[in-house]
Regions:
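Extreme N-terminal starter segment of soluble prokaryotic enzymes
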Residues: 1-3
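A short, glycine/small-residue-rich beta-strand->loop->alpha-helix junction that serves as a flexible
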Residues: 6-15, 160-166
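Short, flexible loop/turn elements at secondary-structure junctions
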Residues: 8-9, 37, 155-157, 193-195
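Donor-binding and catalytic core of enzymes assembling or modifying cell-surface/extracellular glycoconjugates
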Residues: 10, 183-203
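Histidine-anchored nucleotide/phosphate-binding helix
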Residues: 13-25, 171-180
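A short beta-strand-loop structural module common to alpha/beta enzyme folds
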Residues: 27-40
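Short beta-strand segments
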Residues: 33-35, 150-152, 188-193
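Secretory-pathway luminal glycosyltransferase catalytic domains
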Residues: 40-186
Length: 203
């Protein structure tokens, strides 16, 4: 059995889950996640109903939890750095059974061959799906001839503390690139943040 210890924000948890589970399935191993999370001190927004972790949002994933690592397990720790030649670790693909895997494993290359499975694993609760579908229909009815571009402004505590905030020039240049590539198409930008809030100003 391969056990994945999840850590940090929800996006990191999702990548680790999808990547490590895909590795385990590809090798014919059982897969579980550890009930204990790492580094939960820098949290973004927390939904009143669903919280901010994989196991609080996805009921089926919560069923894959174990509370402790059995004796005799090896530990594999991801070692991707800015100087790494690839975003995929060959060592991660070669782990043996009975291993605890630590890290984020942020690369779709680990699971692109299982994309349909990943979409099923992360199927949202029905009430979220219903609310989303209503919003999308409303937008399509209001802008029937437009293309939609979703923009995620990373501005939460973890980004500010670690110095990862991007300047306004980055976002303006990105928006200009989208508009330049779709000159004949009306583009509607859908803006959202790491925290639930309204857009208060545009720069």
């Amino acid at each position: 059995m391969i056990i994945c210890k999840l850590s940090d924000q929800l996006g990191n948890q999702m990548f680790a889950y999808a990547s490590v589970k895909s590795i385990a399935l590809d090798k014919g191993y059982d897969f579980k996640i550890l009930g204990e999370y790492n580094n939960q001190f820098l949290k973004n927004d927390t939904d009143k109903k669903y919280g901010n972790t994989l196991t609080s949002i996805f009921a089926d994933i919560a069923k894959e939890t174990v509370q402790e690592v059995p004796d005799g397990y090896s530990v594999y720790k991801e070692n991707i750095t800015i100087d790494s030649r690839s975003d995929v670790e060959e060592g991660a693909l070669k782990v043996n059974d009975n291993t605890l895997m630590l890290g984020h494993y942020i690369s779709p290359k680990y699971f692109t061959h299982r994309l349909k499975d990943v979409q099923d694993w992360f199927k949202m609760p029905s009430d979220i799906d219903e609310k989303t579908n209503i919003t999308i229909k409303m937008l399509k009815d209001k802008y029937p001839d437009a293309k939609f571009c979703s923009v995620h402004f990373r501005n939460a505590l973890d980004y500010r503390v670690k110095g990862y905030m991007l300047s306004s020039d980055y976002w303006q240049n990105a928006a200009k690139k989208v508009l330049d590539n779709n000159i004949s198409q009306k583009i509607i930008f859908l803006v959202f943040y790491d925290r639930y809030s309204k857009l208060v100003s545009v720069v």
